[in-house]
Amino acid sequence: MPQAVAGPEIERLIQLLARMPGLGPRSARRAALQLIKKREALLAPLAEAMRVACERIVVCHECGNVDTSDPCTICRDHSRDPSILVVVEDVSDLWALERSGAVTARYHVLGGVLSALDGIRPENLNLSRLVERASVPEMREVILALNATVDGQTTAHYITELLAHLPVKVTKLAHGVPVGGELDYLDEGTLSAAIRQRTAF
């Protein structure tokens, strides 16, 4: 086990940073050192922003997005098309699509995908609320913006069957989403093209 290079408070900071996606122990040490060097300009404001976020973040009961209000900012936006619902696996996918600027509809976050390997079944996902939202009279289209993985496509097929009795068109993202690809890692142009060229599922 590597020897501690600083007091327990700094070591704890490094350990917590190392848990972040994309940060290993080395990167976490560099990030911690940068935060410490810029304590007033970076560390203190970051700590305050994290404290406030921890206290105020809620999950939107309408769509499953995270925000500091319920309903969330997107659900409260009356300029969005209420007749189209974009279904995503996770909030990170919602954020990725928002960055593309191609979506003017509303979202629905499933909170995962069906996975026999991970034991994720339909009752573990936000599916009953999806059926409720897709059943409203003004709903015309449900866009399945799910990752092009085996589990993502299995979930897409399940949702298509789940909504088959409703008078809504079910579509999926088109060109630009590679097989095995995840939305959060795609650039805005690719996502924008995928939304515009969606096809019936």
UniProtKB/Swiss-Prot annotation:
Keywords: DNA damage, DNA recombination, DNA repair, Metal-binding, Zinc, Zinc-finger. SUPFAM superfamilies: Recombination protein RecR. Pfam families: RecR_C, RecR_HhH, RecR_ZnF, Toprim_4. It comes from Methylobacterium nodulans (strain LMG 21967 / CNCM I-2342 / ORS 2060). Residues 83-178 form the Toprim domain. The gene is recR. This is Recombination protein RecR. GO terms for molecular function: DNA binding; zinc ion binding. May play a role in DNA repair. It seems to be involved in an RecBC-independent recombinational process of DNA repair. It may act with RecF and RecO.
